[in-house]
Amino acid sequence: MITVFFFLGCDSKTEKKTTKIPLITKSIGDDGAIIEKGKEIFNYDLDLLAQLPLRNLPIIDSTTFDNVEKSGVYDTGFLKRIKFDPGCKDATNFRLKYKIPFSENFTSIVVSYQCGEHELLTTLITVNKKHKIIDRLQIAYDEIAESAFGKRSQVEKDKIVITSSNWMNEEPIFETETYALLNNGKFKKM
């Protein structure tokens, strides 16, 4: 009984102190300037982009199911944060493949992803410094359901030539489209 009274007596004399730790609502940006949290550039996005290989021009992209795993890194949420819309509801296996040094005013990123089990799309995305998508262009395509359709591209400084192939008939059909990448990061069909 004495023990119980002792603990009760000690409890009544103990003061509980809580220290409030202020929340940090500002962070330091790349240039050392303090920026508000709502405008913060995510460091992990910058780190992720820094990991991507930089490919020099000219580039031939013929990404297929056979070679998609050989370059780049899996997306860990970057595409969602920049509000990338793949154009199909069942898109999976997003992979950031490489960057292209078109301009210092925006970043050019090549992304591959599957639509369903049988289609693989590769898209060139231009993103401004605030991580907003400027434009996008599909530069490669592979499908394994019929293995009859494909797309590949040749990327140069002044133009992007995309060649689509259709092997459904005895004679294959090849069609080319040429695009220019404007100084503002938009693609223009030539």
Which sequence ranges carry the predicted segments?
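Sec-dependent signal peptide recognition
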Residues: 1-2
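Terminal domain-start segments
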Residues: 12-95
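Surface-exposed loop/turn elements that mediate protein-protein interactions on large endomembrane-trafficking
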Residues: 70-90, 125-141, 178-189
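Structural signature of eukaryotic scaffold interfaces centered on beta-propeller domains
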Residues: 95-104, 152-157
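Short beta-strand elements that form the blades of beta-propeller/WD-repeat-like
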Residues: 105-115, 157-166
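Long, charged/polar, surface-exposed segments that mediate recognition or autoinhibition
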Residues: 106-111, 115-149
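Short aromatic loop motif centered on NTY/YTY
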Residues: 134-190
